[in-house]
Amino acid sequence: MSDGGSNKEMLASMSPDELRGAMRTLGYRTQSELANAIGVSRSAVSLWLEGKVGVPRPVAMLLRMLISAQRRIY
């Protein structure tokens, strides 16, 4: 059962490098652009990118869904 929990953690979490990649894929060039798009402060995005604070699960899931939808469209 612990493997299931680990898999869920892996799917939900997002490293700073993954966040940078998601920003690039979705066309967000700045922290402010991403922050405005998802309704958070620029400083929150900055903390995530610096690895000082983890990317919240809902944000990671949202970004992954947006990437998935974008790939289906294009």
Regions found by a protein language model. Name each.
Residues M1-S6, Q70-Y74:
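Short intrinsically disordered terminal tails
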Residues S2-G27, R64:
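A short, Lys/Arg-rich alpha-helix, primarily the initiator
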Residues E33-A35:
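Short alpha-helical "recognition helix" segments of helix-turn-helix
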Residues R57-Y74:
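DNA major-groove recognition helix of helix-turn-helix/homeodomain DNA-binding modules
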Residues G39-G54:
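Recognition helix of helix-turn-helix/homeodomain-like DNA-binding domains
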